[in-house]
């Protein structure tokens, strides 16, 4: 199979590995990009798991909260300049308010925009003409608890409840809701910083777990040690993996000497009753969106030729 220069460049951008290593990885995996990333990781050449999540898109994350509930939305724009526009910010804030009532992306898109007979989708389409850029309502989600609090945090907020990264944390408790919300906000800040994969180990996608095990096994076998020792090595690395990606097992950012789970237990004294983190949501602007890269020099040359 012929491997193109574009494929090699894409793999290099994802992993930071050398061109020859990227070409070898693609040859070994018949051009399968995901398998090539794993091949490089197994060889110890790539730190792709840290780089593959890089994404790019503009717009804002919006957060709105009520009594024991909160919602988070993402509305995209073409440029960061528009994201700083007051009219655009008002749209995102209003969409977040709608999300607090309707929750899901589909329901919010079809719901009436505040103060209008038009839907959220149609209102955003109309705004394209006035703001002068392509805009899009991408997603929304909501968390609710019967008792307790849903805490919120917006990182580097450009306005109240608006920024590039928004987090919700649901804490169920019959204790003091103000104390639960205060601790929940600390956990939300932690989630913003660490981006855990799941709340508990059981909630991690089994395919992701098996993938990590396979990579750790291949890495351990390169040591040449007996199978029994390799098994112990893999167990140790999986334990560390869970400590890195499972929220409750992570070292608490505000006090790295304890886990989030232990911090929750300690917070129960202030809350005045048993408490449980039941869910969290983390919306980072542009996750999973590939932003088209443009060659400025080529654009200028093309414009001159017209």
Curated annotation (Swiss-Prot):
Keywords: Cytoplasm, Elongation factor, Protein biosynthesis. It holds the Pfam family EF_TS. Gene3D superfamilies: 1.10.286.20, DNA helicase RuvA subunit, C-terminal domain, Elongation factor Ts, dimerisation domain. Residues 79-82 are annotated as: Involved in Mg(2+) ion dislocation from EF-Tu. It comes from the Bacteria. CDD domains: UBA_EF-Ts. Its main location: cytoplasm. It is found in: Cytoplasm. GO terms for cellular component: cytoplasm. Associates with the EF-Tu.GDP complex and induces the exchange of GDP to GTP. It remains bound to the aminoacyl-tRNA.EF-Tu.GTP complex up to the GTP hydrolysis stage on the ribosome. NCBIfam families: tsf. PANTHER family: ELONGATION FACTOR TS, ELONGATION FACTOR TS, MITOCHONDRIAL. Belongs to the EF-Ts family. This is Elongation factor Ts. The lineage of its organism: Bacteria, Pseudomonadati, Pseudomonadota, Alphaproteobacteria, Hyphomicrobiales.
């Amino acid at each position: 199979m012929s491997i193109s220069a574009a494929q090699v460049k894409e793999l290099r951008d994802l992993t930071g590995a050398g061109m020859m290593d990227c070409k070898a990885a693609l040859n070994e995996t018949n051009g399968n990009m995901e398998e090539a990333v794993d091949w490089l990781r197994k060889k110890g050449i790539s730190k792709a798991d840290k780089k593959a999540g890089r994404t790019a898109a503009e717009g804002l994350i919006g957060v709105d909260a009520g009594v024991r509930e909160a919602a988070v939305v993402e509305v995209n724009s073409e440029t960061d300049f528009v994201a700083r526009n007051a009219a655009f910010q008002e749209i995102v804030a209003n969409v977040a308010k709608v999300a607090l009532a309707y929750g899901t992306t589909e329901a919010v898109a079809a719901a009436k925009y505040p103060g209008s007979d038009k839907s959220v989708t149609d209102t955003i389409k109309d705004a394209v003409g006035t703001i002068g850029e392509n805009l899009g309502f991408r997603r929304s989600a909501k968390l609710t608890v019967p008792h307790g609090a849903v805490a919120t945090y917006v990182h580097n907020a450009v306005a109240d409840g608006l920024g590039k990264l928004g987090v919700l944390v649901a804490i169920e408790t019959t204790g003091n809701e103000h104390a639960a919300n205060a601790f929940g906000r600390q956990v939300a800040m932690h989630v913003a910083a660490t981006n855990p994969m799941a709340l508990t180990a059981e909630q991690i996608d089994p395919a992701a777990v098996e993938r990590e095990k396979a990579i750790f096994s291949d890495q351990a076998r390169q040591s040449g040690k007996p199978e029994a020792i390799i098994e112990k090595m893999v167990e140790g690395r999986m334990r560390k993996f869970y400590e890195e990606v499972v929220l409750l097992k992570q070292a608490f950012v505000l006090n790295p000497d304890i886990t989030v789970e232990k911090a929750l237990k300690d917070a129960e004294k202030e809350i005045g009753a048993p408490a449980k983190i039941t869910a969290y949501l983390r919306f980072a602007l542009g996750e999973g969106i590939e932003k088209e890269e443009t060659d400025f020099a080529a654009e200028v040359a093309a414009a001159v030729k017209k």
